[in-house]
């Protein structure tokens, strides 16, 4: 097909451009919107609970059997596990990039099933859960009582029943966890009364198993000469505290019966007293929402906000919802800035092109070519599975200056023909394209060859370069298509033959500006030529400058700080509080309240969420706490209130005020899924099978070495094996003499203290 066909048939050129623009708009509307490409490895999490066990027991009896079976699952990259003194076991299995998360979860579940027979009965009774999800927190919100009129059990139960089911149904949500517990019937046994009646906890468990049951008694009247048929119904599981108090434990010799209420205090409480939450000093329950892999983060968060806004309308009086962390806040702010830069770049390019072409008709042609090439790029991004993110948008900002070149070349070529005396813009366009067509294709292929090779790079950095480079290459390809089809047709329509008598007219202000600009440009050009001639004659100086430039390049490459992506102010700060081993829950809340007061005194803080019993950088239990600090909007904060300065200020205050806990403030990671913070996270491994206390000493020595380095500000660890514990030593011989077994003693201990 000859290029003059597009010039002779401008409608064809226009239809091609309109078609690719429509396809680009469709692609833009359906592309996932994220901050960065999904580069985090697919992760499958396995969770188990061994109630009453310490971390060592969890490690040996739960994590070890599970890891033995899970290890080596297909496409596994590495495995990481943690055990807590509250009986919780967490195993994270990381897979190679590109692994199907669904198949990974199925494969891990199959391995977990193989380990079920090796786990304690208490663990299998509660259940071992396997789930796939991204590690990044999509949203953290809290339900809090600003009137302090509800107890924490009611708030947690309301969130579990009314909010979480709605949240989990939102498209794109991978998981939603409540940092709280369900309503449960708490039976607090009285050991002294139990001893009087010669009872042990297993007697109570047996009574509960006998009388707190669901049953299907059946029906009668099914056959025979009956008028009606009836179904027999049993009351089922007990619901009220009084019903549990009436459970019969045993019959007494005097004819009376001993009931559960006689040997225990019964109340409706929490399943476990692991977590405590506060929002701005009020009782609360916090919920963490995780994203499903491949989902549109922007759309998911928008849907979540709609669900929460609707739920807010029906909340009991005094309850409110506070969003502590919202990935959309920074995402929208970042994309807004990139789009703003995109528009500014377009305007600047338009102005520069107009100043040099000095003709509005000529300027319109590149101005039309730019949005056509950029919008069409979104269609190809959709086809190859990319997303709208900061990398692809930044590539388009840079591409503006490149995609405009092809259109300018066409316009300048047609102008050159008109300067030669062509009286027909169509003929000038045809002749110009016969000369420029091959050159446009050649320069386009050369430019694309600069960016396409990065698509073959592997690893995390390769993913970043790939999205940036291929976006550039696609934009350049569409700019060439425009230069071969649309731009020549527009030249034939817009451009007019030069008027030879235009010099006799009175010059307008715009023409006088153009004349002055041309004179200034010619003056600068003469000076430039003079310097070029000077360097041509002084070749040694030219080579010397090149050598000096290379030396400076190497020097600055060595001294310039490096990183994957720059750290930015996301509007959120995370805090991790590590208390001394064995700290009680009441003491933990006292210290966390002091940290909360310290944070509240910072004027840049908008809201704060305190979570006791949960650590973002590791560990669960009373000795760990977390804080989510939401800063005021960027427009409401000064330059001296950016997140880095606030982090430093809070850290220094905490070091001075909080002496009985480690308090660390940090910014959330710029690339989600790799770590809990944007700092360096290291994991040490003991391959010698030595003692935990010796391993802890090695960790402390390593941390001291880190702190001694000038580039390290602080180093902390949540690992500490020195939690205070009582060693229970059972005399097996004495047990046999008494007619009991050691397991009977352990079961009794678990009934009272588990």
List each model region and its residues.
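Membrane-helix entry/capping segments
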Residues: 291-295, 301-348, 380, 388
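Signature of alpha-helical transmembrane segments and their immediate interfacial
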Residues: 1-33, 436, 506-565
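Helix-loop junctions and hydrophobic alpha-helical segments within the transmembrane domains
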Residues: 324, 331, 335, 411, ...
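Hydrophobic, glycine/alanine-rich multi-pass transmembrane helices and their short helix-loop junctions
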Residues: 327, 351-356, 375-391, 441-492
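Hydrophobic transmembrane alpha-helices and their membrane-interface caps
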Residues: 24-30, 35, 45, 347-416, ...
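Surface-exposed amphipathic alpha-helical segments in non-transmembrane regions
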Residues: 14, 21, 25-26, 30, ...
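Transmembrane helices with small-residue packing motifs
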Residues: 11, 19-57, 77, 113-123, ...
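Small-residue transmembrane helix packing/gating motifs
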Residues: 272-295
